[in-house]
């Protein structure tokens, strides 16, 4: 079970990096295509937009499902405290700082 957890942790870090890289790669590729397309630009761009939106929807749904499964697994294993602290600490900290700033201005 520990080996599986380690593999998942590694895959998470890699997946985050690969997402950011893939987005930048897509942008550069689209620019190259648009330059080489020339007269046929309009037809190709319409089809590209449709394809992209479909792929994005799929990726979003997959991410949501994964998160829900992970949260269920943590409760069973009893490691919920450590992992939750790591994930939610940043969000909570940001929220608090925003609130404090607003109060100070008022």
UniProtKB/Swiss-Prot annotation:
It is found in: Nucleus; Chromosome. Residues 1-106 are annotated as: Disordered. Its main location: nucleus. GO terms for molecular function: DNA binding. One of its GO terms (cellular component) is nucleus. Keywords: Chromosome, DNA-binding, Nucleus, Repeat. Sperm. Disulfide bonds: none annotated. This is Protamine.
